[in-house]
Amino acid sequence: MRIVIYGGTFNPIHNPHIDIAGAALKQFSLDKVYFLVAGNPPHKDTAETIPDACRLDMVKLAIEDEPGIDIDVREIYRTGKSYSYISFTEIKKEHPEDDIFFIMGSDSLLYFKNWVKPEVISQCADILVAPRFGDDMAVLNDAINECKSLFTGDFALIDYKANGLASSVIRNDFYKDENVRNWLNPKVEEYIIDHNLYSPYSYDYEDILRLSQEMKKELKSSRYVHTLGVATTAYSLALKWNYPAYTAMIAGILHDCAKCISDEKRIAVCEKNNIPIRDIEYQYPHLLHGKVGAYYCKSKYDVFDEQIAHAIAVHTTGCPGMNLLDKIIFVADYIEPGRDKQPRLDILRSEAYRDLDSCVFMILEDTVNYLNENPEMVDSTTIDTYNYYLDKMKGEV
């Protein structure tokens, strides 16, 4: 069997990665490509990375419809730095009778002799080099010849030139230039948006403290205790579902920031700032606290992340097709530790960590049952959301 290992951080994986793997499969008559997702590589700044689980998820999404391509997770679960020679020593022991190859970019080849124990790698695998557009082929061929003189094993060029797009460009420009998204599998693009990866906004513990103090001044004591419960539950759910935890906590802290103002003020804020008010919201102005909270999030508390604002806006009614943060805040608001009157809370609290969509649906189901007993309070958005997640549970969405 002829197998090839394609190593990298894949932060994120993009279409040229898949194209290179496909070109190598065809050119060298390979049987299998394994994307070896790096854990803690010695040459990367870990501050630039995202949760390992997110990188793994994106690789799985990118390759799930690609025949002959699979994933190797050994480095993700290894403690300490991820040195390639360790992985290739293991792989060779696992496949003693197989021909093993290693795909690397042309930039990596130029420094291969400076890697830790490159001679071990070359003893275990032949090196396949992926050139990029703009490479000086004379320099690249000289580097290949030098490596051949220094190490055992073969070094060969893949007959494919990658466009030279670096993953760092996607990370930096994802929200600024939609053209870079054309280099991504649509499922990977959707995952990045849903998990708020590479966001220009980041938060730290100082932001948590600042906004917590603001809420302590703005809210009644019982509402503030509830807010802390939602924030900590959102943090926990974010860790479970691979969403930036501090971002989720900020959304939890601010979700009720307009809860303790008067109905008259909520209506006035909406009318002054052209925030649409539906008939039922005029009838029950407390329903506006999400919309007003989303406005205050930016105008009063200097939090400009659109995902946070949207999660605050829909945290009471939900909406069809909620993103991940929407669901985290919607659920956290319902199941936080201070809640004790809703039905089947123990089941919901468990379900939130097993299947978030299922938990959302169960909450909507209980909410609709309550509203059916109080039909004058029915909000059409809640009904639309319930119907959407009912279809989702049936596999029709």
Across the structure, where does each feature detected by a protein language model lie?
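Histidine-centered active-site/metal-ligand motif
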Residues: 14-17, 43, 226, 255, ...
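Charged phosphate-binding loop/patch that engages nucleotide di/tri-phosphates or the phosphate backbone
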Residues: 179-208, 369-397
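Residues at secondary-structure transition points
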Residues: 49-54, 78-82, 221, 225, ...
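Nucleotidyltransferase catalytic core that binds NTPs
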Residues: 1-207, 298
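N-terminal leader/targeting helix
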Residues: 81-91, 95-98, 257-289, 375-385, ...
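Internal alpha/beta core interface subdomains
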Residues: 361, 365-369
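Divalent metal-dependent catalytic cores for phosphoryl transfer on phosphate-bearing substrates
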Residues: 213-217, 235, 239-362
